[in-house]
């Protein structure tokens, strides 16, 4: 009882569609798990057993009310720049590869992915498979282990998702189906039109046109909605407009920014802007340097753009500066690379904390943690015990000063500069409230507290899809599926 969700392009809503279907199915008592054979993302999540997967698959697992597992995302590609990506295989670092070399390994990786899928089927019964990017990338058909080659092996019913907000939805859908290989085209059993602005009934003639053109039923027209769910990739950063608010926070949009979902709770209560290196930091109440897949290269980008100097100037004016993971490493005096991170050498950090980070070998830390913040005012002392996860290479040694959390991180004497390896810190309400309360107080204001979500966002998502999706018809597709002989 499984289904494959493909898209006409990236960012059409495949991930949230899978999450919605998973939550709808589990609410109906159907055991289900998500699966994406290959994901390319710098936003990742660490499972309970220390495996690293794409954050979208973790989100989908939560929607399905199951624990995230490396089987749900057996191949994760984390771009490092210069056409190089780190390959995370079944949750653990495999190797760094050039894209051209990666394509030489797709047969091997596909075998691993198919095996992971079958393990999920055995454990959960139903699996909702998500493709990657656009399904009709004809130049990649022979090595596309997330869409076409996977579809050839699994022979699942396919539902195609298109984003009408972008325009050209008829060409998107018709063109994608027409370009699919002959043996895959008959597997397309349904179409979902996503992100419709306005009354979906106004698109009834469009639905008929699409069905006449393709011979495939449209299973739903999903109106555009905003929900508090994690974003998967940096494309979503391009959709974020400059914010206005009582308190302004600058998050440096590093070239290889990773896990920017760390700040989505802050975005609900402050004006959080993601600024490229070189953009002005004037007028911001706090500066956050986020995680990165390449600390050395992004540190050099900060220095070359003048942002490193601007951060030091802001610190001199009393603006809090916070570093998360790679950003924490940059706050130190020195970064030493044996060549495993980027290029061999010793690099000057921002010098705001007395610490040294060394990259040596290919060891990677991936672990869920719980830590107590140091009793250092005016921010950390209000956090208490927090939880999150570490995903990093390199080791950091604090030469002098205090740790920010029990046994980890660093904080300045005045408490206004601190760094930690802890991803997810500001998704903890107490931590976000501690920071926001201080920032509001500096403006002569009182922060009224983190707004509690009374309803589960996954239930809200499922309700939204159920209202506009022919779910019974879609479940029938799943139920009617019997594996065919792979081509």
Curated annotation (Swiss-Prot):
Q: Name one GO biological process term.
A: cobalamin biosynthetic process
Query: Which sites are catalytic?
Result: 325, 423
Gene3D superfamilies found in the cross-reference section? 3.40.50.880, P-loop containing nucleotide triphosphate hydrolases (3.40.50.300)
Entry keyword set: Cobalamin biosynthesis, Glutamine amidotransferase
Q: In which pathway does it act?
A: Cofactor biosynthesis; adenosylcobalamin biosynthesis
Q: Which Pfam families match?
A: CbiA, GATase_3
GO molecular function, one example? Answer: ABC-type vitamin B12 transporter activity
Keyword RNA-binding listed? The answer is: no
Q: Does the keyword Coiled coil apply?
A: no
Query: Where does the record place the GATase cobBQ-type domain?
Result: 246-431
Reading the lineage from the top rank, the first entry is: Archaea
InterPro entries in the cross-refs: Class_I_gatase-like (IPR029062), CobQ/CobB/MinD/ParA_Nub-bd_dom (IPR002586), CobQ_GATase1 (IPR033949), CobQ_N (IPR047045), CobQ_synth (IPR004459), GATase_3 (IPR011698), P-loop_NTPase (IPR027417)
Q: Which family does it belong to?
A: Belongs to the CobB/CobQ family. CobQ subfamily.
Q: What does this protein do?
A: Catalyzes amidations at positions B, D, E, and G on adenosylcobyrinic A,C-diamide. NH(2) groups are provided by glutamine, and one molecule of ATP is hydrogenolyzed for each amidation.
This one is known as Probable cobyric acid synthase
UniProt organism field: Methanosphaerula palustris (strain ATCC BAA-1556 / DSM 19958 / E1-9c)
| Record lineage | Archaea, Methanobacteriati, Methanobacteriota, Stenosarchaea group, Methanomicrobia
């Amino acid at each position: 009882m499984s289904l494959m969700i493909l898209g006409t392009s990236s960012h059409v809503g495949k991930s949230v569609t899978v999450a919605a279907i998973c939550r709808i199915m589990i609410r109906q008592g159907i055991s289900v798990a998500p699966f994406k054979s290959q994901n390319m993302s710098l936003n990742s999540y660490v499972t309970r057993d220390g495996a690293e997967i794409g954050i979208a698959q973790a989100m989908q697992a939560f929607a399905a009310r199951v624990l995230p597992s490396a089987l749900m995302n057996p191949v994760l590609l984390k771009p490092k720049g210069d056409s190089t990506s780190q390959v995370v295989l079944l949750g653990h670092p495999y190797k760094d590869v050039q894209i051209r070399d990666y394509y030489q390994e797709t047969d091997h990786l596909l075998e691993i992915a198919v095996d992971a899928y079958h393990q999920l089927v055995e454990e959960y019964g139903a699996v909702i498979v998500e493709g990657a990017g656009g399904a009709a990338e004809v130049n990649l058909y022979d090595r596309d282990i997330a869409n076409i080659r996977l579809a050839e092996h699994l022979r699942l019913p396919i539902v195609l998702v298109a984003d009408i907000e972008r325009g050209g939805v008829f060409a998107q859908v018709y063109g994608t189906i027409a370009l699919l290989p002959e043996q895959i085209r008959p597997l397309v059993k349904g179409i979902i039109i996503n992100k419709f602005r306005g009354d979906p009934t106004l698109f009834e003639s469009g639905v008929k046109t699409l069905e006449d053109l393709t011979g495939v039923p449209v299973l739903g027209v999903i109106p555009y909605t905003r929900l508090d769910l994690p974003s998967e990739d940096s494309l979503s950063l391009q959709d974020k407009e400059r914010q206005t608010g009582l308190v302004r926070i600058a998050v440096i949009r590093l070239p290889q920014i990773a896990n920017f979902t760390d700040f989505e709770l802050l975005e609900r209560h402050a004006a959080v802007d993601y600024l490229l290196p070189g953009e002005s930091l004037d007028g911001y109440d706090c500066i956050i340097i986020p995680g990165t897949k390449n600390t050395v290269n992004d540190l050099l980008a900060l220095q070359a753009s003048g942002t490193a100097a601007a951060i030091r100037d802001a610190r001199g004016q009393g603006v809090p500066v916070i570093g998360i993971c790679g950003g924490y490493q940059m706050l130190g005096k020195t970064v030493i690379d044996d060549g495993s991170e980027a290029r061999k050498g010793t690099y000057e950090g921002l010098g705001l904390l007395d610490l040294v980070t060394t990259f040596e070998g290919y060891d990677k830390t991936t672990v869920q943690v719980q830590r107590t913040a140091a009793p250092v005012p005016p921010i950390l002392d209000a956090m208490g015990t927090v939880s999150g996860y570490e995903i990093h290479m390199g080791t950091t040694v604090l030469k002098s000063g205090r740790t920010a959390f029990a046994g980890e991180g660093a904080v300045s004497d005045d408490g206004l500069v601190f760094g930690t390896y802890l991803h997810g810190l500001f998704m903890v309400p107490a931590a976000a409230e501690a920071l926001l309360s201080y920032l509001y107080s500096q403006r002569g204001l009182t922060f009224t507290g983190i707004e509690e979500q009374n309803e589960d966002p996954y239930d809200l998502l499922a309700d939204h899809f159920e209202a506009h999706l022919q779910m019974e018809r879609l479940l029938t597709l799943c139920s009617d599926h019997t594996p065919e002989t792979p081509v």
